């Protein structure tokens, strides 16, 4: 096989399983090598294909799925040029065609000789594999199904040009690599290694419609985000207000709503602000829109991290890229804590107004501030009724609201979070008290 001749997709030849399969395709009949060693490598390859398939949730022709997965994850000059934008013209496209011709040889390989050589029909397992279509430890089901569709299409393709078009269309629709195939990310510091932006696999699939009420703040957030994903001017957003009012849920709903339009989100904690420049360097040239998300953001008077954040948002020599915004949630309107004792200290400050402005200037760098207030009693009861109906909870309304009032008095007061916790409590009661339809 010609994997050593790959140019644009050269990183594929570093994949051990592909190398082993390529070696078997060339040498499985070569008597120079011990038969037992060849047979052991054959079974090891089949084992690894099955392991990867079950981990990813693949089904159908697993060999084709494996190759398709390599292609959609390979970040190279061609795939990056095509992500979100589509086919690129010129010499790069011609060089990519050369590689797809080699990939077609892997797709079309006839394994019947190996089966005859080793006397086993085990390859039948991977040609039409029926896996658990509900589970994938790597991708969400939609992306997993798309990769399986790509595998099916490239396996049936008549030419390298057709394979190239199928894969390129995937890049245009979904992107490539970790940023293309995942919604949300976090910063990781593996021991002894550099900072990494890692995909978050298990995300909360909350929708904006799931958040009962708060229509005005939700619409403000939607309007700003839609402008951003459409390439129009948009602002950094600060969502502030009472605890449990849906600030974080709204952010989660935003990424789920606009992921299909190229929106991605990176969660950053306060102690990771020093990594922001490196994060932005990794994402500024990608064809996606990135929200850097900071949850429950606030600073004590002795913390200085807010100064780094100010420089990142606006004020440093390097301009923040057009494909990056910062969204933050906080229970504090002004983010930096102030005490009455600060007034006493400012009596000795010759430029006390400058000190005040220093602490307020971070908030000013968020162009849009959206207030989420706690619901009143009537709004709280409406949230409870909507959530009860949504979860098929059947109780007399008077009893439902009476129990809800008792719950909020004992569990943190009036908020959307308290209402949801009350509903979760009801769902956990003994059957017979509550009827929940399947």
Q: Each PLM stretch: what is its role?
A:
Residues 1-154:
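Intrinsically disordered, low-complexity N-terminal extensions of AAA+/P-loop NTPases
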Residues 133-197:
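Interdomain "pre-motor" coupling segment immediately N-terminal to P-loop NTPase/helicase cores
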Residues 150-154, 196-219:
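Dynamic helix-loop-helix/coil hinge segments at AAA+ ATPase domain boundaries and subdomain interfaces
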Residues 236-267, 278-284:
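Walker A/P-loop
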Residues 263-266, 277-321:
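Conserved nucleotide-sensing/catalytic segment adjacent to the nucleotide-binding pocket
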Residues 300-348, 354:
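Conserved catalytic/switch belt of AAA+ P-loop NTPases
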Residues 347-360, 367-381:
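Conserved AAA+ ATPase "SRH/arginine-finger" region at the nucleotide-binding site
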Residues 369, 373-438:
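C-terminal alpha-helical "lid" subdomain
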